[in-house]
Amino acid sequence: MKKKTYQNVKRGYWNGKWYDSSWELALIVYCHEHGIELTRNTKKYPYKWYNHIEYYQPDFILEDGTFLEVKGINDYRAKRKVSSIPFPIKVMTYKEMKPYLEYMTLKYGKDWRDRF
């Protein structure tokens, strides 16, 4: 099965933290500006996919140990990955990300993605 790739995705570092999308950037900026400790996760967890083992790496960890996964599309495979984590995990779909995206637009303007 071919992996999906997305063009024009914003990636890079902000304030020493790596982000893989503008949604992740919005979350990082919000947490930084509100004193919420957010750490990039580096651990991978195995999950079974079509009779072989794949590895899943959630995006972030909060200081209470909760994993955060920023996910634009929460399809079957994404749900399968998330279910492989033996720890609390919160999937941040558009509904959960909307307040952070609105925060960025209100504070930095509609073009905030281009300005960071």
Model region roles, listed by residue range:
Residues 1-116:
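Electrostatic, structured charged patches in enzyme active sites and in nucleic-acid/phosphate-binding
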